[in-house]
Amino acid sequence: MGCHEQRSSAPPRARAAASPAVAALTPPAGPRYPGGFSFMKTVQPVLDRHCISCHGLKAKPAAKLSLLGTQTKFRIDGYPNWPRDIHATVSYESLLHRPGLIRIAQRNRETASSKPDDYFARASKLAPFLLAGHCPSLLKDQAAFRCIVAWLDLNAQYNGDYSWNRDEDRKAHPKGEKALRAFLATRFSSDLAKQPFAALVNVGLPSESRALRAALALDAGGWGQLANPMPSRTVPEYQQLTALVDKAVAPTAQQDREGTCNQKRCTCGSCWVRQAEEFWRKRMRTLAAGAK
């Protein structure tokens, strides 16, 4: 039974063999990283490889749909009836707001009794559109297509965790970005070096950055999209590029602390609990010391 079905309609208990072989779980497609499924870490690399050449890098994106991973924010309906801004990427906003392209289950707006075709990949237009051959290179890349379907079936979520200081929110480091662009201009082309930062570096998962994957030969596990690609990950030149990509991403200013944002200007609304506790513990220690 699903969570929106009537309890009285539960089917009778079916008896089956007690000793079937337990099937091994198949890991999901895409890169491995700590935490839950992240749009920026799993889906954006697919878009960077197969989509942004038409939907982002041109002056006028095809179908007026930009799939660049440039950070942005947009207004959503909160809960309950509390409008707020969500931090995401241009690509996420474009896919989410194109009518009918993505079909998600929004809280308190689901159908009374959910059916398989109500939401997710089966109800969204995106998966059938890709299966029809819109992007042959993506359709040929089955792992990439499975990443898209997994994202749709996970209700098109953006962040991979509930941290207040997320990898997805990191920014470019000015000096690091300048050094990276200089390297790309010298090794590949000035045109590549001038592309938007988000088209070169994935701040959420730098190892999946287009600057790295496109520069690596296909037979070495890369995308082989640039002229004279690097032959392997072990050559000094590729290791230098990897270090430059890492340095082009600024670290988060703060780290979560005891489930709170720990930021100078609190955004979680709960830092006062920890701060009050620390204040009174210090006060009690002072009083205890004075009583001796």
Features from the language model and the residues they span:
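Aromatic- and Gly/Pro-enriched helix-to-coil junctions and flexible linker segments
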Residues: 1-292
